[in-house]
Amino acid sequence: MAKLSKRQKLIREKVDSTRAYSVDEAVALLAELGQNVKFKESVDVAVNLGVDARKSDQVVRSSTVLPHGTGKTVRVAVFTQGANAEKATAAGADVVGMDDLADEVKKGNMDFDVVIATPDAMRVVGQLGQILGPRGLMPNPKVGTVTADVETAVKNAKAGQVRYRTDKNGIIHAPLGNVEFSAQNIKENLEALVADLKKAKPASSKGVYLKKITISSTMGPGLTIDQGTLSI
């Protein structure tokens, strides 16, 4: 039997897998368990939803602007032209273009994290589906990345908007910040996400919708959150 590392021993000692934690308790515990990690760990959430992800009408796909962002610098590319190109640049977009930007994407030059497109640009972006799709970069109106309001879309992306959809098990995964965030900021980010998830509940979903909420750090364990401690 393999020997447990010091970190694994500490997790076994400190984490009670039979209980649910408040966000304050969970953030404090993740910070304690990550004291010897050599990089800034992210804090992420997994939300188990009461949906059947095999049914197209129960797939939950949306986006949330986290009030305190994710703690990461987000690079934004915008496919548009004319006055909208000027608006996108003024709003803080890192790259703006049309056919010229498409050519860069085809060459593999994709130094950006989010792609936004105006509806008229989709004739160009549509040809890039096989490149952008597998990377999770394909613009989609359901998450606000295909829009005529590029100014708001760019500002939201820069402010820490997270995009998500249920995986095959009906689970949503999203970042909430990092271990240097205060517990209050993590909590408010989580509450904003959960509020939007509730709005996105499919009409055909029956029974308990928010089945389980778990937060974790990059190298840490998953801690179940007591939903009664959230303002949702």
Swiss-Prot record:
One of its GO terms (biological process) is translation. GO terms for molecular function: rRNA binding; structural constituent of ribosome; tRNA binding. Keywords: Repressor, Ribonucleoprotein, Ribosomal protein, RNA-binding, rRNA-binding, Translation regulation, tRNA-binding. It comes from the Bacteria. PROSITE patterns: RIBOSOMAL_L1 (PS01199). InterPro entries: Ribosom_uL1_bac-type (IPR005878), Ribosomal_uL1 (IPR002143), Ribosomal_uL1-like (IPR023674), Ribosomal_uL1/biogenesis (IPR028364), Ribosomal_uL1_3-a/b-sand (IPR016095), Ribosomal_uL1_CS (IPR023673). Gene3D superfamilies: 3.30.190.20, 3.40.50.790. GO terms for cellular component: cytosolic large ribosomal subunit. PANTHER family: 54S RIBOSOMAL PROTEIN L1, MITOCHONDRIAL (PTHR36427), LARGE RIBOSOMAL SUBUNIT PROTEIN UL1M (PTHR36427:SF3). HAMAP family: Ribosomal_uL1_B. Binds directly to 23S rRNA. The L1 stalk is quite mobile in the ribosome, and is involved in E site tRNA release. Protein L1 is also a translational repressor protein, it controls the translation of the L11 operon by binding to its mRNA. Part of the 50S ribosomal subunit. Belongs to the universal ribosomal protein uL1 family. This is Large ribosomal subunit protein uL1. It comes from Marinobacter nauticus (strain ATCC 700491 / DSM 11845 / VT8) (Marinobacter aquaeolei).
